[in-house]
Curated annotation (Swiss-Prot):
Protein name according to UniProt: Ferredoxin--NADP reductase 1
Organism expressing this protein natively: Bacillus subtilis (strain 168)
Binding site for FAD: E37, K45, F50, V90, L125, D287, T328
Protein's UniProt keywords contain Oxidoreductase: yes
InterPro entries cross-referenced by the UniProt entry: FAD/NAD-bd_sf (IPR036188), FAD/NAD-binding_dom (IPR023753), Fd--NADP_Rdtase_type_2 (IPR022890), Ferredoxin-NADP_redctase_2 (IPR050097)
Keyword list, A-Z: FAD, Flavoprotein, NADP, Oxidoreductase
Gene responsible for this protein: ycgT
Length: 336
């Protein structure tokens, strides 16, 4: 190994919710930790696309805005002062003769570590934009691929195109404050949580199925109406709007990690029940992980992160305890 290089016990790739909580738990296990995040700020997909979305599937928290959750996770992670690197994508992976792992960043910077925890979600995310020549001219006006501020839609006629969790959740969040909310989905069935779909259908939200968004009609100021088409009959309708939200999913790219020799299944990194990958010293947690009966919730990732940390600790020190002491007894936390 090159001399005078700082070597970390754990380097976490990804600074989203799971990466942040994993960094906290690394501190509980007294592991020297670095977090590398591709984006210019921490929080991952939650900060980027869902800062105002209310998250309700974390035990003990009836509901919390995405941005508030991230702020609390950042504060928690900072307890043990992990080093944070932003605006850097990890492109290279190399193992030296002494077992040290060298990660290369997008600008050529080398990061030396004894273990790696992949908490990078599904990799880099890019929204699936509406396939229309007009979409680009309306982006930044009244065409949106996410909701940054709920109040911006107050008293507006809103159309949401999509049928997954995000589309359903935004419909429910906006229904009390918008003048009207219309959801356009190309299938009869929705992909959201059953209770959320039921809530939407029992509210004032207008649901159009099976319809697809076909055309944007407007001028230099923005979209004035949209044309939707019935996927079976071909019947078309024009809907006057003030704001259009498109939730057509994401393009997912694990990027250079696909070349590291990791076992990949269904676009995710295959893990065992200890969150170990097929590469020694490399672990995974959160949406990046694949295993049987995987639970795709933040709450599930909050369990996987500590499991990965405990496995990393055992990898570094086979005589170590299986898990950290309870946080209520930790010397850095007992007076907080």
């Amino acid at each position: 190994m090159a001399e005078n290089q700082e070597v970390y016990d754990v380097t976490i790739i990804g600074g989203g919710p799971i990466g942040l909580f994993t960094a906290f738990y690394c501190g509980m296990r007294e592991l020297k930790t670095k977090v590398i995040e591709f984006l210019p700020k921490l929080g991952g997909k939650v900060s980027l696309f869902f800062p105002e979305k209310i998250i309700r599937d974390i035990g003990g928290i009836p509901g919390i805005a995405g941005k508030q959750l991230i702020e609390q996770l950042k504060e928690q992670a900072a307890t043990f002062d992990p080093d944070i690197v932003l605006n850097q994508r990890v492109t290279g992976f190399e193992r030296l003769d002494d077992g040290t792992i060298v990660l290369t960043g997008s600008e050529g910077k080398k990061h030396y570590t004894r273990t790696v925890i992949l908490a990078c979600g599904m990799g880099t995310l890019e929204v699936n934009e509406f396939d229309s020549e007009d979409a680009a001219r309306y982006a930044g006006k009244n065409l949106h691929y996410g909701v940054e501020k709920l109040d911006a839609f107050k008293g507006k006629r809103v159309v949401i195109s999509g049928g997954g969790d995000t589309a359903v959740d935004w419909a429910n969040e906006l229904e009390p404050i918008a003048a009207s909310v219309t959801v356009v989905h190309r299938r009869e069935e929705f992909g959201g949580m059953e209770s959320s779909v039921t809530k939407m259908k029992q509210s004032s939200v207008r649901v159009l199925t099976p319809y697809r968004l076909e055309q944007l009609n407007g001028d230099e100021e923005g979209i004035k109406s949209v044309t939707v088409c019935h996927t079976e009959s071909g019947q078309r309708k024009d809907i006057e709007i003030d704001e259009l939200i498109i939730n057509h999913g994401f393009k997912i790219d694990l990027g250079p990690m696909m070349e590291w020799g990791l076992e990949i299944e269904e676009g995710r990194v295959k893990a065992d029940r200890h969150m170990r990958t097929n590469l020694p010293g490399v672990f995974v947690a959160g949406d990046a992980a694949f295993y049987e009966s995987k639970l795709r919730l933040i709450a599930g990732g909050f369990t996987e992160g500590p499991t990965a940390v405990n496995s990393a600790k055992a990898y570094l020190d086979p005589k170590a305890e299986n898990m950290a002491m309870y946080s209520t007894h930790h010397k850095k936390l007992v007076h907080k």
